[in-house]
Design a protein with these regions (language model features):
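Active-site glycine-rich loops that stabilize anionic/oxyanionic intermediates
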Residues: 581-586, 597
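Active-site-proximal cap/loop segments of hydrolase catalytic domains
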Residues: 95-97, 104, 597-814
Length: 814
């Protein structure tokens, strides 16, 4: 009997192990259906850059999706940076694999001679006179700088010393001169990792509040500090026709900006102590003006670490910020200071003041103007015009003022909600002044400016436009607008007097291409490029922007894709995949606005849900998930779960009522905050058959100083954080959920442990869950094999739990 009993136990153990092992897959990479793989790997249209004169077009091919083997190469992750230890460059880049030129007038294309045989180019920039083009070339052990002569179409390497591009890129000084940072020592002599630390790592705080977000890839040890200093210390060099001259001493540069008259530099250098709490851009720093030989002329600021910056929307450190040169003067630096001790809720008439200091920088700073909200920047024009922007993130408000530099007078031109897309006037059209700086272009004797809006949101969908704005009447007149049935926007104003435009035009069936358009002469549009459709798999797939309402009357939209040849009467209702990302609004009217256009060509990236329309699914992409403040006393997130549920119910209902979506076979998915949304919907409703949640944060106690636009802390809104955390309701998640996360996620708040713990919590309560950890991936995925495997995992999840799910009674929200 004992033997039989023992044998029975062995059989049970074997069966248990078999089930467990089968659930783990075999660990190898899988491919999705061919149509999906072909679309992912399709060669995209070239990227385009046009010179200032509108004569030449530079076209480039970008290599997407490197192999996982490339991602697996060594890297240091320190101070918010990811460093290639061999070449003083970022470790993760998408490189340009081909460069060529096209004459816009003739349409003739030109091959570039002298390019490296294996091109890994980046940072392409035109020279001031548009006769040359510079780019970087990255190899395994160094970064070089090349210059293309546009007239001869020849490229030549111009540097003698390898570049260091970790703390900034090269800049054109003039048509024959470039400034760049160089490596000061071979990467091969980087500090070796000690066999053991000298002692424990210690962090301290003595009475100062430091409410910082949960940044990733931070400095964690004295060895990290050594590496940061080694790799980021660089020598500034001036290169004149290939001859290099050192400028100043090696330093850890934060930024280098050349004055419009080319006589000075505005330099920020980082200094110790290096922070273990914030990334490099938050380290202590010096702000100084130097001459072009690197000699200090004026010390402007000695800034502390950002560790003690106050938390909350629109709060800032009590230090000068926003240092920059005025574009309309030879050498005048400007900056901003808070007038409210850095706290926006302080009751003061003005919250910021902007100051200036002109060369030779030996006078007292001059106050230019004050702002009633937070200063957001200025666009310079001439001696009588500049446009000053101010706003409040917390109140979703922005304001543009006219500033007269000669008199100091300011006048409000417009104020709007940042979420009110319909009222967005666009941005000013600029032109280059005598110093080669972009300044506002004025028309009609200086009474009007041109405004370009490449989105052009409207109740009919996005219709980009070019308008004139009257500075006196404060009214806009549309000069040109994209025709309904297409999506076309102004890329460049080629000739303002003739109103000759370079535009980019597309429809839902026609790939984006570039056109020359003459509004005054009303000539027929001339097509400049002839890019072809990379996705024949989507031919005859239908796309429409659908409009519907949720229970409280808020209007919603989404982009509905239906399979090729689908007929609702013949084929019946389809399984549905809804992809979304929540957004907060203070205004229900703003939330209800139409966003996007059904007439845009569908361009796919690695994260798209549209792939699955080729596999027989109705895909509702960009399904709107607004979270709206319901009163002045409430913030949007106070009703997060209820509004999320209403949004989902409305989407399912409209697809069901249209006769295209089977409400009993619906999946929901999202990335990042969309993953957070997905987990919450599965925790609090019974609307879905499955969920796909990628790179999300599920436990809000791990993001205690705010997330997204929520600026209340965990301790100020403990119940809110608890209610919004799907981790706290993991025992309620019985709907199958696929969790995906990059194992090296570098996004604030979305540490991989969020998905790891969510998986364990759901598993521990008997839920159906799978966790896919993608090796070497960040918050956005890059590795070819990883992405193909992820697309296949999503496909098999949808097939198993949605398309082929057993039909049950109609799904209810609760």
């Amino acid at each position: 009997m004992a033997t039989k009993h023992f044998s029975f136990i062995v059989v049970l153990i074997f069966l248990h192990l078999s089930v467990t092992l089968n659930a783990q897959d075999d660990g190898s990479y899988k491919m999705p259906p061919k149509a999906i793989a072909d679309m992912l790997l399709a060669k995209p249209s070239p990227t385009v850059s046009v010179d200032d004169k509108g004569e030449w077009m530079l076209l480039t091919d970008i290599s997407l999706y490197p192999s996982v083997e490339e991602l697996a190469r060594p890297e240091f992750r320190i101070a918010g940076m990811r460093i290639n230890p061999k070449n003083y460059a970022p470790s993760r880049q998408n490189f340009i694999s081909n460069i060529w030129l096209k004459n816009i007038r003739s349409g003739k294309e030109y091959k570039i001679n002298g390019l490296p045989s294996s091109l890994f180019a980046g940072s392409v920039n035109w020279s001031p006179n548009n006769k040359k083009i510079a780019f970087t070339q990255t190899t395994k052990d160094k970064v070089d700088l090349y210059v293309i002569d546009v007239a001869t179409q020849k490229a030549m390497k111009v540097n003698k010393t390898a570049l260091n591009v970790l703390r900034g890129n090269y800049q054109w000084y003039d048509d024959n001169t470039l400034l760049y940072l160089t490596a000061i020592r071979p990467a091969s002599i980087a500090p070796p990792k000690p066999l053991m630390p000298k002692g424990p790592t210690t962090q301290e705080n003595y009475g100062k509040a430091s409410p910082r977000p949960t940044f990733q890839d931070l400095i964690r040890s004295p060895y990290d500090e050594q590496l940061f200093e080694f790799y980021n210390t660089a020598q500034l060099v001036k290169n004149v026709n290939g001859a290099e001259t050192k400028i100043g001493q090696p330093a850890i540069y934060g930024s280098i900006n050349i004055s419009p008259d080319k006589k000075y530099m505005l330099v920020r250098t980082l200094k110790k102590p290096f922070s273990y709490v914030v990334p490099a851009q938050g380290f202590p720093s010096h702000i100084v003006i130097t001459d072009m030989n690197g000699k200090a002329v004026k010390q402007l600021a000695d800034l502390p670490s950002a560790e003690t910056a106050p938390g909350g929307n629109d709060n800032v450190q009590l230090v000068p910020r926003g240092f920059d040169w005025r574009d309309d003067e030879a050498a005048t630096v400007i900056w901003c200071m808070p007038l409210d001790s850095g706290f926006i809720k302080k009751n003061v008439d003005y919250h910021d003041a902007v100051y200036s200091l002109a060369a030779p920088f030996n006078n007292e700073p001059l106050e230019l103007f004050k702002t009633k909200m937070r200063y957001r920047g200025v666009t310079w024009g001439n001696t009588t015009l500049a446009l000053v922007n101010e706003g409040l993130q917390g109140k979703q408000t922005t304001q543009t003022n006219r500033y007269n530099p000669s008199t100091g007078e300011t006048e409000k031109l417009m104020e709007r909600n940042t979420t009110d897309a319909y009222s967005n006037p666009g941005f000013p059209v600029t032109e280059k002044n005598q110093w080669g700086q972009e300044v506002i272009r004025l028309i009609d004797n200086g009474s009007k400016i041109l405004m370009n809006n490449p989105t052009g949101s409207s109740p009919k969908g996005d219709l980009p436009f070019l308008a004139s704005f009257d500075l006196i009447t404060k009214k806009s007149d549309i000069i040109w607008r994209s025709k309904e049935g297409s999506f076309e926007y102004v890329v460049k104003l080629m000739d303002a007097d003739k109103l000759e435009l370079l535009t980019r035009k597309e429809t839902e069936k026609e790939v984006p291409n570039y056109f020359l358009k003459n509004l005054k002469l009303k000539l027929a549009d001339r097509q400049i490029t002839d890019f072809t459709d990379p996705y024949p798999q989507l031919d005859n797939v239908s796309k429409q922007k659908i409009k519907y309402k949720r229970a409280d009357g808020v209007d919603l939209t989404g982009d509905l894709y239906l399979p090729k040849g689908y007929n609702a009467n013949r084929d019946g209702k389809l399984p549905v995949f809804i992809w979304a990302y929540p957004a907060e609004f203070n205004s229900a009217a703003d939330a209800a606005q139409v966003r996007g256009s059904e007439h845009r060509f569908t361009l796919l990236n690695w994260g798209s849900a549209v792939y699955y329309v080729t596999q027989g699914y109705a895909v509702l992409n960009n399904a709107e998930m607004p979270i709206v403040s319901t009163s002045k006393e409430k913030k949007p997130n106070d009703d997060f779960i209820q509004q999320l549920t209403m949004n989902a119910e409305a989407a399912i209902h409209v697809l069901d009522s249209m006769g295209v979506g089977d409400r009993n076979r619906v999946a929901v998915g999202g990335h990042s905050y969309g993953a957070f949304m997905t987990a919450n919907l599965l925790a609090h409703t019974k609307l879905f058959k499955a969920g796909i949640a990628r790179s999300g944060a599920y436990n809000r106690s791990l993001t205690p100083f705010g997330f997204q636009n929520e600026d209340r802390t965990y301790w100020q809104a403990l119940q809110l954080y608890s209610d919004m955390s799907p981790f706290n309701y993991a025992d309620k998640i019985k709907t199958p959920i696929l969790l995906v996360h990059g194992e090296m996620d570098n996004n604030t708040g979305t540490f991989p442990i969020q998905s790891e713990r969510m998986f364990n919590a759901i598993k521990g309560h008997g839920g159906t869950v799978k966790y896919l950890s993608l090796p070497y991936e960040s918050h956005g995925y890059q590795g070819r094999e990883n992405i193909l495997h992820m697309l296949n995992e999503q496909f098999t999840w949808l097939e198993k739990y949605v398309k082929n799910a057993e039909k049950k009674e109609e799904k209810k929200a609760f």
